[in-house]
């Protein structure tokens, strides 16, 4: 089975509110194809502005020899929040990442609708423009798009990975209390499976040398086994090749400010 890159960022789509990616849409598609991948998905930071560029480039290549089975898929990396976000509420004042991927044109319509709704609630908070999607917004949308959109738990900036890391030390210090945290993680997964439908929500693992990501990967596999929820492996790509890493680092450091969600 060929790899399909589900979680990727481009300069055209993810640099609207912050410095994030040095990838260019045409280069991403070409490189994924050259590696023999089955396809590539664009999941920008609450933005669908790269979709048109991606579709145009794909349409100009899909009939060429060797491109018959390659697919370009469109998604979005939203900020899935509780509705009590305020500047004073430091604990809940986070903007957890969450991945949406359209399985068809109808699904992409739903992603566009949700993105539009999020932008109507934008506000400037903590040095950058914030664009929240509330859980209630996602529930309302998925009532009409179940089976057309898949969701995933995203990167370390996601709600589930963040919770796993937040209470990591509690696992040894107070196993009884940690069991409650563990159950809350399983409850959150069950909630997502209910919203998206069984088999349409995924736990997201990412290859990394970072101890935090390695820990989260192990815990997500354990949660997958205990809940029967499938997992995917993504690269959360912000640059194409290993040798581009330093260039990407310099790009991020060229502007002060908080990149995080």
Where are these predicted regions, by residue range?
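Phosphodiester-processing cores and adjacent nucleic acid-binding clamps
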Residues: 1-261
């Amino acid at each position: 089975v060929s790899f399909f890159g589900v979680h990727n960022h481009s300069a055209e789509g993810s640099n609207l509110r912050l410095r994030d990616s040095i990838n260019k849409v045409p280069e991403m598609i070409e490189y994924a194809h050259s590696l023999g991948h089955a396809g590539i998905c664009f999941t920008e930071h609450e933005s669908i502005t790269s979709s048109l560029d991606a579709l145009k480039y794909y349409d100009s290549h899909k009939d060429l020899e060797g491109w018959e089975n390659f697919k370009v898929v469109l998604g979005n990396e939203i900020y899935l929040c509780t509705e009590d976000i305020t500047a004073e509420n430091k604990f809940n004042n986070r903007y957890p990442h969450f991945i949406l991927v359209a399985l068809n044109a109808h699904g992409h319509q739903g992603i566009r609708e949700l993105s539009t709704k999020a932008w109507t609630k934008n506000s400037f908070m903590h040095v950058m423009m914030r664009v929240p999607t509330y859980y209630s917004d996602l529930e309302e949308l998925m009532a009409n798009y179940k089976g057309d959109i898949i969701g995933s738990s995203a990167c370390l900036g996601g709600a589930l990975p963040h919770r796993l890391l937040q209470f990591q030390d509690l696992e040894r210090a107070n196993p009884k209390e940690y069991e409650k945290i563990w159950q809350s993680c399983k409850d959150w997964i069950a909630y997502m499976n209910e919203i998206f439908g069984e088999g349409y929500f995924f736990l997201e693992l990412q290859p990394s040398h970072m101890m935090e990501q390695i820990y989260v990967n192990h815990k997500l596999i354990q949660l997958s086994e205990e809940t029967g929820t499938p997992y995917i492996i993504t690269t959360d790509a912000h640059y194409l090749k290993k040798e581009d890493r330093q260039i990407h680092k310099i790009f991020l450091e060229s502007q002060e400010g908080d990149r995080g969600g």
